[in-house]
Amino acid sequence: MADATTSRIDFSKIKSIINSPDLLKVQLDSFHNFIQDSVPLAKRKDQGLERVLRGAFPITDTRGLYLLEYISYAFDKPKYTVEECIERGLTYDVSLKVKLKLSYKDEADEPDWKETIQQEVYLGRIPYMTERGTFIVNGAERVVVAQLHRSPGVVFSEAVHPNGKKMFSAKIVPTRGSWIEFQTDINNQIFVYIDQKKNFLVTALLRAIGFARDEDILALFDLVEEVSLKASKREQLVGQYLASDIVDMQTGEVISARTAITEEIFEQILLAGYKSIKVMKSFSNNEKGMDKSVIINTILNDSSATEEEALEIVYEELRANEAPDIEAARSFLERTFFNQKKYDLGDVGRYRIKKKLRREFEELYSFIGEKPELKALSDTIEEKILQTIQTYSDEPIGEDILVLTHYDIIAVIYYLIKLVNGQAEVDDVDHLANRRVRSVGEQLAAQFVVGLARMGKNVREKLNSRDSDKIAPSDLINARTVSSVVSSFFATSQLSQFMDQTNPLAEMTNKRRVSALGPGGLTRERAGFEVRDVHYTHYGRLCPIETPEGPNIGLISSLSVYAEINDKGFIQTPYRLVDNGQVTDTVVMLSAEDEENKITVPVSIPLDENNRIAVETVQARTKGDYPVVAATDVHYMDVSPVQIVSAAAALIPFLEHDDGNRALMGANMQRQAVPLLTSDAPVVGTGMEGKVARDSRAVIVAEGPGEVVDVTADYIQVRYQLDADNNLRLSMLDPDEGLKTYKLIKFKRSNQDTCISQKPLVRIGDKVEKNTVLADSSSTEYGELALGKNVLVAFMPWRGYNFEDAIILSERLVYDDVFTSIHIHEFEANVRDTKRGEEQFTRDIYNVSEEALRNLDENGIVRCGAEVKERDILVGKITPKGESDPTPEEKLLRAIFGDKSSDVKDASMHVPAGMKGIIIKTKLFSRKKKIGLDIKEKIELLDKQFAAKEYDLRKRFAKWLKHFLDGKTSTGVYNDKGKVVVPEGTVFEESVLAKFATAQFLESVDLSRGVVSSDKTNKNVTRLIKEFRFLLKDIADERENEKYKVNVGDELPPGIEELAKVYIAQKRKIQVGDKMAGRHGNKGVVGKILPVEDMPFMADGTPVDIVLNPLGVPSRMNIGQLYETSLGWAAKKLGVKFKTPIFNGATYEEVQRELERAGLPTHGKVSLFDGRTGERFDDEVTVGYIYMLKLSHLVDDKIHARSTGPYSLITQQPLGGKAQFGGQRFGEMEVWALEAYGASNILREMLTVKSDDVVGRNKTYEAIVKGQNLPEPGIPESFNVLVRELQGLGLEIRIDDKVP
C-alpha cells in the first residue's frame, strides 16, 4: 500500500494544532457561493448571482403600465463532459434559466395589475467551474486569478507642499459611482474634488445637502459661541466674526454673518438693542483644545450663502455649464451620491467607513442629539436622503445603507480636522486592511451587472414601444446580451489566464495567485516601489517569497498556506489565542485589521507542560516592529512555522538557510519542472509534498472506508461501506450499492504540451480509508509530489566545463532515461464550407506518392502508432481551387479521364520542421447528421435505455419507502397547498405507498410536516424523496442531452464541418543546452555530458551523476543545497526518506548525526578520483544526493537558424524570433565591432543585401545561383522609410544621383 512507502523520518519539533485548508478552496468556494447551485431556492442567500438578479429587477416602462419582476433562477446540467469539451474546442457551461413575472394594466393610475404572466426564460450559458477549480473555454483550460485591489471605503492620506506645510486628504471610494475627495490646502481651507474634476469649498457641499446657513454649519462643528454684550467683553469680541445676521429692527440695517467685529460694529450692535450675539469660536477659547479654524476659514472664503447658490456652484463645477433650474441641480447631486442605482458603497465600503469613523460617528450622534434645532435639521436631511432606500436598522446608518449620507460627509470632515491637529493618523494604502481580494465569484458578478444593465435598457425600450397587446417575458429578453459580456470576460480579461499546467504545482499556484493588475487595479508602469514591497500585514496572508522576477515583481503574489479569504474579501490567517500567558487551543481567523495593534509571538517560543509560555519575556511582533514584551502581554501565537509562506516555498527544504532572492527563484522554478518518464519523490522533503499532490487533484483519493473491487490501467473500482446509520449508503438510491468507478487519465496533453498520465497504486482486495491514495499522476510518487530526481552530486570544477553555472552530467542519466520526459503535441485540421465549395479529408491526393500516404487511413488521417518526422503528412486534405470556368473541351477530357487535379489543391497538414515522434491518438469529429433511419434507431435505443434506468430507480425507491414506512401509521400527509393526501391514522400498506411513486404526488407533497411520528423515519423519508426527485430530473436531463447529441451530430465551433486532431508524443532525453535547477535557486544549463568512465568517482568506484560548480554557492548564499546534499546522502545510505519542514526542520547537528549513523564523514566531504587519469583530486569534495529538476526551457524548443524567410512589410528587414522563422538582429554594437576591425565589405553586406536592400538581395541570390560575381548594393529600404518620415514632417528630401 502507498502509505507504508511514503513514511518519512520527521525532524519537526513543533506540531501544528490545525490542518491547512484545501489549497483550492479559494477558487471553489468563491464560484459556488456565487451560483449557489446546490442550495435550495428558499435558502439562497442574498449574494452572488441572486443579489445581482435582485438588483437588476424589477424593470418598468416609463408609462408605468408594465412591471417585470424576478422570482428565481435555475441551472441545467452541462451538455458535455470536461473531456468532450477539451477535445471538440467547446465551452464547459450550463444554461441559466430565470423565472420572471410580467404584470401589466391598461392605465397607470389603476391600483391593481390586470394580468400577470409567469415564465421561465433562457438567459444564456455560463462557463461552469470544474472540480479542479478551472474553466474550459473554447476547449482551453483557463483560470480566473483573484485580484487584490483598493478596498472601497474611506482612505486618509497626507502630502507635503513645497513650502513644507502638510496637506491632508480623505477619499471616499465606492464600489460603483463617483469618487469624492476632501483636501486641505496651504491656506487652511477644505476643498472637495468629485471624480478629480474642478474643486469647490466643502461648505458649499454641506449647504447643498441641507445645512444652508452659516450658523447650521458652525453648529455642526461646535463653532458657535453666544457672548453677552458687556463692556468688559468688548476687547474679547473685537476681531471675531459674526456667526449669524444682526438686524437693527428700527433702521432695518443688516450686519451679515462672517463680518469681522470692529469697535464701530460693536457700537452698532449695542445700539440695535442686542443683549447677546452669536460669534464664531476662536481657537483660543475653544475648551476642547482642538483648532477648528479650518472650517471658519472655509466659510469666510465661501462665495455661497444659501442652499440654492451652493447647488449652482456644485452643478457648474461638475458639469461645466449652468444648471437649467435649482431642481435640476438638486436632482443631479442626489443622483451622484444618494441614489442606489448610481452610487453603491457596497457591503465592504459601508463596513470600512463605519469601522474607520466609529469614534467620529459616536461623537456626531451624541453632539447632534443634544442640540434640538440641529437634530431636527439632521432628521429632515436624513429622511430626504433615505426616502428611496429600504432600511432595516435602528441606527442612523445601518449596514444596509449603501449610499452616502450627511453623517458620512460630516464624520470625514471631523477626522480631517483631527488630522490637521495631529490627533489622528493617516492610512497606509499598502496595508492589507485597505486592500481586498476580488475572487472569481465577485468578478463574475461584476460582469453580470454590466450584462443585465444592458439587458434592462433593451427591455425598457421594448416595453415603451409596445401597445397593450399581450407579451410574455420571453419576448423581452435577449439572452445574447448577458452571455456575450460573460464570454468576452473569459476570453479577453487580463485576469482570465490560460492555465499553467506544466506540473501539478504550477497548476495549483496559478489558482492561488493574487494579482494587483487588471481592470480597476494597478499597471506595471504606474506601480511604485512601496506597493511592490513586502508589508508587515502580509505575514501569514501573502507569501513574502513567491513572486515573478520581471516587471511584475511584487504585483503578483501567492496566498500563504493557511490563508483564507473572508466574506468581505479580506485575507485572514489563523492564530492561537493567548490568555494571560496561557496558550489555548482556540484558533481564531484574523484579518490584517483585526490583528492591528495586537501582540503576536512565533510558534517556536518555549511552552511548559500546561501550555503556558515558559519564559517571562519573549520577542514578539506588533505592526512592523519586534519588541521584547512580557509573556502576559501576548495576545496571539502563530499556528505553524509554515504559515508565512506559499505552498511552493514550503516545498523547499532548509529554506531558512537560503537567501530570499534564491528562495524566490527556487519557488518559481519548481513550477517549470517537466514531468519525467518515471517520477521520484525527494528523499529530503518538507512534508508538504503529499498535501500539494492531493489538493491539486493530481492524484485520486478514496472518499471513505471501503474495498478495491477492480483495478485496470484505465479505471479503479471501490465499493464504499455503509455509513453510520448502517442502512443509508452514500446514496440510498445508488444502483451500484456504493460502488464507484474512477477513470484514470492516460497520456493526456497538458496546456504546456507536457504529459499527464495516472497509474493505479492499489490492488484488488485492498482495504482503503478516507484520503487513501488510489492512483498516482505523472508528477507524483505514492501520493507525494515528485517533480525531479535524486542524483549523486559533487561540488567541484571540472576542466572549466562548469564555468558560469554550467552543469556536467553523466551519460548514465541519458542512457537510463533518468531525465527523459514525454511531450505531447496536438495538431488540428478542420474542414470548412468555403465559397468555392466544401473542403474534404481524404487519402486520395493528386501528385503525392504512395510512400507519403502509407500511414494514412481511408479518411486521410494518420494511423496510431506511426512514427513520423518533419514534412510527413498527418491529415490529408484537399480544398477547391475556384479557378475560372473550364472550356467545353476541358470538361469533356475531365469527364473521360476523371482528372480532378485541376479542381482542387493539396491542403494537407504536415509535421512541422524539427519535430519527430509517435502518433498516440487521433480524433475525428463531424457535424454532419447521420442518415434519418440511423438517427431514429439510435433515439429508440436511447429511450429504451433511459426507460429501464427510470424503472430501476422507481423500483429501488419503492423498496426503500417500504423499508421505512411499511406497517407504520400516518400522522397526516399534506400537499403544498395544505390539502390532506393521506389522512391521519392511515396505515402505510402497499396500495398507499404506491401513491408516493406518482409524479404528481412527489412534486406536490409537503415534506416539512413529516409523515409519521418518528423524527428519524421522517428524516430518512424526506432525504429519500428529495434524492428520488433529484435523480429523476437527472435521468430526464441526461436523456435530453443524449438525444440532442444524436440529432445534431458532433457539436463543433461555428463554421467548422469536420475536425481532425492528431497527437504526437516525443521522448526527449536530457541534452546539452537544457536548463536544470535544484530547489534552492541553483539553476544552470547542461554544459557537457561525459561518459560514465570520465566522471569523478569515489573510493569504492561509484561515479557521481552530476558535477556542480562550488563557486555557485557562496555568493548566492543558498546554503540550503549543501544541507540537502549531505542529508540526502545519509537518506540514500540508510534507505529512508526525511521530512524537514521549513523553520522547523533538521539542525546542523542532526544532519551530522544522520551522516554518522549512515557511516559517512560528518563534514560531508570525501576524496574523489579523476575518471580520466584515475588520480585522486588534491582536496576533498562535498558529495551527496540533491533533488534536481529538468525545466521546461528545452534546447529543442529554442535552437533555431534562418536561411531565408519572411520580411517586415514596412522596413523590408527580416523578422525576429523562432515563431516567425526570423533572423538574429545585427544591432548597433555589432556594427561597431565590424567597424573596429575595418571589415568594410562584410559591414556593407550586413546593412544592405543581407538585410533590406530588396533589389540587391534578389540580384545577389540570382548571382549566387548562377555562379556570377555579386552586384553592387542598392539603397536599403530603411533609408526610404526615413525619407518618407521626413516628408511626413514637411521636409522635402531628394536623392541626387549626379553628385560625384
Curated annotation (Swiss-Prot):
Catalytic activity: RNA(n) + a ribonucleoside 5'-triphosphate = RNA(n+1) + diphosphate
Gene3D superfamilies named among the record's database cross-references: 2.40.50.100, 2.40.50.150, 3.90.1100.10, DNA-directed RNA polymerase, beta subunit, external 1 domain, DNA-directed RNA polymerase, subunit 2, domain 6, RNA polymerase alpha subunit dimerisation domain, RNA polymerase Rpb2, domain 2
Class of this enzyme: transferase
Cross-referenced InterPro entries: DNA-dir_RNA_pol_bsu_ext_1_sf, DNA-dir_RNA_pol_bsu_external_1, DNA-dir_RNA_pol_su2, DNA-dir_RNAP_su2_dom, DNA-dir_RNAP_su2_hyb_sf, RNA_pol_bsu_bac, RNA_pol_bsu_CS, RNA_pol_bsu_protrusion
Gene Ontology cellular component terms for the protein in this record: DNA-directed RNA polymerase complex
Domain of life: Bacteria
Keyword Transcription among record annotations: yes
Family the UniProt entry places it in: Belongs to the RNA polymerase beta chain family.
Subunit structure: The RNAP catalytic core consists of 2 alpha, 1 beta, 1 beta' and 1 omega subunit. When a sigma factor is associated with the core the holoenzyme is formed, which can initiate transcription.
Protein name: DNA-directed RNA polymerase subunit beta
Organism: Chlorobium chlorochromatii (strain CaD3)
Gene: rpoB
